[in-house]
């Protein structure tokens, strides 16, 4: 049996800082503006493994741009808001049902967080054709971008995009599926919980995807 985590953990800020670029002499590189906190499985003492990745990614979005936990709703509050809005049926609060980008955008508006703008990528497209949108987003003050799909239902956040000299495209991924008490960002980087990945290896051709872009109101 895995030991329970403490009820409150010290959340780490801007855990991508210090990562090297994914290729030598990149043609283009764009990173998010502002600051964020890394929310992950169990970071508030609630064992949400297997269903909470969307909520944790949403909490990371809510912590932007100041990188502060004040005002970031907990999982019960997020579920209660979705139930109160009529997006989810009675009894959703306290369940282990996951959420995606559509629910995240509703919660961002409900709680007065950063603005969430949705983008749908059809099955088989991957990120093809959206690289320019991401470059524009990150170079004009945009925050983290939540990603989720159907066949690939593991929510994650995009923090940046990079194009190599040979036209290979990479995205900077923040993975909320970590369980434990991270000591520092170097530990997370070494284990791959935040890092650059090739677009073609991240996006499943059998899945559609939704993206939720965050911006200041």
Swiss-Prot record:
The active site is at residues 53, 175, 177. Keywords: Cytoplasm, Hydrolase, Protease, Thiol protease, Ubl conjugation pathway. The keyword Transferase does not apply. Coiled coil: none annotated. Its EC number is 3.4.22.-. Changing residue 98 to A: Does not affect isopeptidase activity. It is found in: Cytoplasm, Cytosol. GO terms for cellular component: cytosol. It comes from the Eukaryota. Widely expressed. Expressed at higher level in brain, heart, kidney and skeletal muscle. GO terms for biological process: protein maturation; proteolysis. The keyword Transcription regulation does not apply. GO terms for molecular function: deUFMylase activity. Thiol-dependent isopeptidase that specifically mediate the processing of UFM1 precursors as well as the deconjugation of UFM1 from target proteins. Mainly responsible for the maturation of the UFM1 precursor, a prerequisite for conjugation reactions. Belongs to the peptidase C78 family. This is Ufm1-specific protease 1. The lineage of its organism: Eukaryota, Metazoa, Chordata, Craniata, Vertebrata.
